[in-house]
């Protein structure tokens, strides 16, 4: 792990040896650590453990869960993977190490291990995660834990170079500059998209850029991820040299290795303005207007057409039949660039049909749908005709 890439590394006070009582072993030397430091390390560990356990407790509501974070900020790690890596019942979360970064700030590294039966799953590491922990006012007469969590990306912001361009705040790793042409094109796209779908968006839009997929993963706090499929990994599967990373965090941050990741910018703006909309429609709007990495919507649509032509028995009248499927997407050269969830591409085709046949204002009616069948009620499509309708609009 290069110190240049991670500015906190040089300031870390690394301690090693004994186990903290009641927790999994990790290398923090309690024997020689000052009493105040011991207490701080214990509280950091207790905070993380309590937060993880809150996902299996029916008595913990969302407000309580947000209280574990600085200023109640979004849990970026949960946003990153829908919580599956951290909190699923067939996974175990363990603390690997806690390091003091300086002041009241700590780095906590945790890992998820499989709990599936069978020798092949013994000590199988699925992911290694890093979060930042900061001391805040404890409240309640000092009885509350004074530490709060924040995503590692929050910890990295001070080390990134900030450039403001027409309402977009770019944050770049050292040695990485903003191409004016790309920034100008994205700014125009953002302005038009906000006017169309998210006029209440207050901004600013924070756009974090790192040149490689590996750097993006590390900025996000994901140090290791065993999976390679787009539903469970930190980046979509791909087999070309066009390596791509794009994620949205909270309501105002995009992290990407592309300067003009219009798909994820559109997705962020839609999620921030229409948080209760169906993911299919959110993703569909993002794909229709923003494409996917350097692929246009027409490339994505052509890939969907080819896929469905080879899957004539796939019944599209019920989203349970395809919500967990992904398909290869390629450009005009026929080279597969990525493996993309089918749900969002079907959503994009529905969005296109709605705009062309019924007008842009009708798309906002789609954003208000509560379930898959509601989409077709808005469009006036009988339930018996859904499968033929989707195949027909391609």
Residue ranges of predicted features:
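N-terminal low-structure segments adjacent to metalloprotease catalytic domains
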Residues: 9-161
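Acidic/His/Gly-enriched intrinsically disordered linker/tail segments
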Residues: 275-394
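Juxtacatalytic substrate-recognition/specificity segment
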Residues: 160-278, 295
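Surface-exposed helix-capping loop/turn segments at secondary-structure junctions
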Residues: 58-62, 196-203, 359-363
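Solvent-exposed, acidic/flexible segments
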Residues: 37-45, 175, 179-187, 254-263, ...
């Amino acid at each position: 792990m290069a110190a240049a890439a991670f500015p906190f590394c040089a300031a870390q006070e690394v301690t090693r040896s004994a186990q903290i009582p009641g927790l999994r072993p990790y290398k923090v030397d309690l024997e020689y650590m000052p009493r105040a430091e011991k207490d701080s390390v214990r509280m950091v560990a207790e905070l993380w453990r309590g937060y993880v356990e809150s996902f299996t407790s029916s008595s913990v509501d969302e407000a309580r869960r947000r209280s574990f974070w600085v200023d109640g900020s979004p849990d970026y790690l949960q946003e990153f993977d829908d919580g599956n890596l951290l909190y699923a019942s067939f996974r175990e979360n363990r603390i690997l190490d806690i390091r003091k970064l300086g002041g009241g700030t700590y780095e906590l590294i945790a890992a998820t291990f499989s709990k599936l039966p069978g020798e092949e799953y013994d000590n199988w590491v699925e992911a290694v995660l890093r979060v930042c922990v900061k001391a805040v006012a404890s409240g309640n007469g000092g009885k509350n834990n004074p530490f709060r969590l924040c995503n590692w990306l929050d910890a990295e912001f001070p080390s990134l170079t900030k450039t403001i361009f027409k309402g977009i705040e770019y944050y770049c790793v050292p040695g990485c500059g903003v191409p004016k042409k790309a920034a100008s094109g994205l700014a125009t796209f953002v302005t038009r998209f906000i006017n169309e779908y998210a006029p209440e968006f207050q901004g600013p839009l924070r756009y974090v850029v790192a040149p490689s997929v590996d750097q993006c993963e590390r900025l996000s706090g994901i140090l290791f991820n065993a999976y390679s499929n787009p539903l469970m990994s930190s980046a979509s599967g791909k087999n070309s040299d066009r390596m791509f990373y794009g994620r949205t965090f909270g309501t105002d941050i995009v992290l990407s290795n592309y300067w003009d990741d219009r798909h994820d910018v559109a997705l962020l703006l839609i999620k921030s303005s229409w948080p209760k909309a169906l993911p299919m429609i959110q993703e569909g709007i993002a794909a229709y207007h923003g494409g996917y990495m350097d692929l246009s919507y027409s490339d994505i649509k052509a890939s969907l057409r080819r896929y469905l032509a080879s899957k004539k028995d796939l019944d599209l009248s019920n989203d349970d039949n395809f919500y967990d499927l992904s398909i290869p997407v390629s450009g005009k050269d026929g080279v597969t660039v990525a493996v993309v969830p089918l749900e969002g591409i079907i959503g994009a085709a529905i969005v296109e049909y709605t705009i062309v046949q019924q007008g842009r204002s009708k798309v906002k009616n789609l954003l208000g749908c509560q379930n898959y069948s509601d989409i077709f009620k808005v469009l006036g499509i009988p339930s018996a005709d859904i499968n033929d309708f989707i195949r027909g609009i391609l």
